[in-house]
Design a protein with these regions (language model features):
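Positively charged n-region of N-terminal signal peptides that target proteins for export
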Residues: 1-4
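C-terminal region of N-terminal signal peptides and the immediate post-cleavage residues
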Residues: 7, 16-31
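Beta-strand-enriched cores of mature, soluble protein domains
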Residues: 26-155
Length: 155
């Protein structure tokens, strides 16, 4: 009888642990090996007349494959000037044929940055990860977006 009473708390602990794990795992991205997508943005609409803290820059540009030959989608978003002549804080969506990827990232006037992938649609639904934003040319007319994805179907 004593042995049976000692097993009851153990069984209850296992059941509660199982329930907690299942409840917290619901709708979480399924992390697999990950996926990297590399596109090149042609920044043709990024213009601002007066540069001042708090100013908003909006954009809508085409994105090309990693060889910079074929158009594979577009992007749109906005940036707010945070530090004059130095940095912006940006939010944008990149539209590809199989879904969208949304990013929140700083943008530096004079160097590469890294941002957070905050979600997506289609194939990129539930995706998370990070994105490298690199100057493709020194003039800032083209930028490499390298998405490092995990989570979501097939990622």
């Amino acid at each position: 009888m004593k042995r049976a009473l000692l097993l009851v708390p153990l069984v209850v602990a296992v059941v509660v642990g199982f329930a907690v794990v299942n409840a917290t795992a619901k709708d979480k991205p399924k992390v697999k090996h990950g996926n990297t997508i590399h596109v090149i943005e042609h920044a043709t609409t990024d213009t601002i007349d007066v540069d001042a803290v708090g100013h908003v820059l909006t954009f809508a540009n085409d994105v090309f494959d990693s060889a910079d030959h074929a158009k594979v989608g577009s992007d749109q978003g906005y940036c707010v000037r945070i530090v004059l002549h130095h940095s912006w804080e940006c939010n944008w969506t990149t539209f590809l044929h199989d879904g969208q990827i949304t990013v929140e990232a700083p943008f530096s006037d004079d160097g590469n940055t890294v941002g957070a992938i905050t979600g997506g649609t289609g194939t990129y639904r539930n995706a998370r990860g990070w994105m490298e934003l690199k100057y493709h040319d020194p003039q800032g007319h083209e930028f490499d977006f390298v998405f490092h994805l995990h989570g979501g179907p097939g990622h």
